[in-house]
C-alpha cells in the first residue's frame, strides 16, 4: 500500500465518521429545543438559526475540498461509495427537518412584530379617542334629551319652547268680600208678539183691514204657469233682430232651400282650386 493511500483513508474516515454523529446530535438537539424556542424570545431563535445556517456551508466546502485518491482498490471504492450515499441521505433529511422549524420561528417572530405594530398603532388611536371623548362631553350635558320618535319640525319646536321657559306663577288673591249683599229685584215676563195670533191684533188695525184703505194686497195670480219653452223665449228675446217688413217676409221652406243652395255653392268653390293645381302640374 502506498503511504498516500493510507493517509487519504483516515482523512476521509475522520471527515465522514466523526462529523456524522455530530449531525445526528445536532438534529436531536434541534428537535428537543423546538418547544423551548417557542417559550423563549424570538431573538434567541433567530440567532440560533443564523448559527446553524453558517455551520452547514462550512461542512459542504470541507467535503468538496478533500483530495480524492487516484489509485484505490475495489474494496476502498465500495467503502467510499457507501459513505457518500449515507451522507447524501442525511443531507436531505436535515433539509426536510430544518424547514419545519424555520416557519415556526418565523411565525413567532412575525407574531411579535405584528403585535408590536398593533401596539404602536394603537397608541395614537387611543389618544384620538380620548380627545374625542373629552370634546363632546360639554355640549352633551347642555343639550336636553330629545325623543327619538319625533320629526325634525317637532324637535325644533321643542327647542324653541324650551328657550321660552315655563309659565309664570300667578299668586291667587284669597281676599274675601266684606261689603253689603247684592240683590237683583228685576223680573222677566214673556210678552207675545202683536199680530202673531188674531187675538193679539190691535183693534184699530182690524178696522183698517175691514175698510181695505191704504193697504196694497198681493197681485192676483192671473199669469199662466211658465214652462221651459217660455223661459227660453224670454232669454233669447234680447238677441233677436227687429221685426222684418211685410214685403220681405218669406216662408220657412224658402229659407231652407236658400241655405241648401249656399252650402252647395260653397262646396263647389272649395273644390275648384285643387283642379287648377293639377292642370299646372300636367303642363
UniProtKB/Swiss-Prot annotation:
Keyword Aminoacyl-tRNA synthetase assigned: no
Alphabetical list of InterPro entries matching this protein: Calpastatin (IPR026998), Prot_inh_calpain (IPR001259)
SS bond list: none
Gene Ontology terms for molecular function: calcium-dependent cysteine-type endopeptidase inhibitor activity
GO cellular component: cytoplasm
Sequence segments annotated as region (Disordered): 1-186, 212-283
Any Pfam family matching the protein: Calpain_inhib
The UniProt record lists the keyword Repeat: yes
Protein name: Calpastatin
Species the sequence originates in: Chlorocebus aethiops
Regions of compositional bias (Polar residues) in chain numbering: 1-15
Ranges of biased composition (kind: Basic residues): 21-30
UniProt crosslink position (Glycyl lysine isopeptide (Lys-Gly) (interchain with G-Cter in SUMO2)): 32
Family under the similarity heading: Belongs to the protease inhibitor I27 (calpastatin) family.
Amino acid at each position: 500500500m502506498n503511504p498516500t493511500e493510507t493517509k487519504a483513508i483516515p482523512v476521509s474516515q475522520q471527515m465522514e465518521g466523526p462529523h456524522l454523529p455530530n449531525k445526528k446530535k445536532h438534529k436531536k438537539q434541534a428537535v428537543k429545543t423546538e418547544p423551548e424556542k417557542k417559550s423563549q424570545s424570538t431573538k434567541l431563535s433567530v440567532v440560533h438559526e443564523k448559527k446553524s445556517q453558517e455551520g452547514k456551508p462550512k461542512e459542504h466546502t470541507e467535503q468538496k475540498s478533500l483530495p480524492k485518491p487516484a489509485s484505490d482498490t475495489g474494496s476502498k471504492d465500495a467503502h467510499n461509495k457507501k459513505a457518500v450515499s449515507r451522507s447524501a441521505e442525511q443531507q436531505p433529511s436535515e433539509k426536510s427537518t430544518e424547514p419545519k422549524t424555520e416557519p415556526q420561528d418565523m411565525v413567532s417572530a412575525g407574531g411579535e412584530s405584528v403585535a408590536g405594530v398593533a401596539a404602536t398603532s394603537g397608541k395614537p388611536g387611543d389618544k384620538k379617542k380620548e380627545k374625542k371623548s373629552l370634546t363632546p362631553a360639554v355640549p352633551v350635558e347642555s343639550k336636553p334629551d330629545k325623543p327619538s320618535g319625533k320629526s325634525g319640525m317637532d324637535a325644533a319646536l321643542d327647542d324653541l319652547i324650551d328657550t321660552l321657559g315655563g309659565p309664570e306663577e300667578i299668586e291667587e288673591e284669597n281676599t274675601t268680600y266684606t261689603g253689603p249683599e247684592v240683590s237683583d229685584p228685576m223680573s222677566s215676563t214673556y210678552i207675545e208678539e202683536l199680530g202673531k195670533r188674531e187675538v193679539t191684533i190691535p183693534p184699530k188695525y182690524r178696522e183698517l183691514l175691514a175698510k181695505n184703505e191704504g193697504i196694497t194686497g198681493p197681485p192676483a195670480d192671473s199669469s199662466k204657469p211658465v214652462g221651459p219653452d217660455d223661459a227660453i223665449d224670454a232669454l233669447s228675446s234680447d238677441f233677436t233682430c227687429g221685426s222684418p217688413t211685410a214685403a220681405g217676409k218669406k216662408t220657412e221652406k224658402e229659407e231652407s232651400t236658400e241655405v241648401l243652395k249656399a252650402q252647395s255653392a260653397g262646396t263647389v268653390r272649395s273644390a275648384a282650386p285643387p283642379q287648377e293645381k293639377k292642370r299646372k302640374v300636367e303642363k
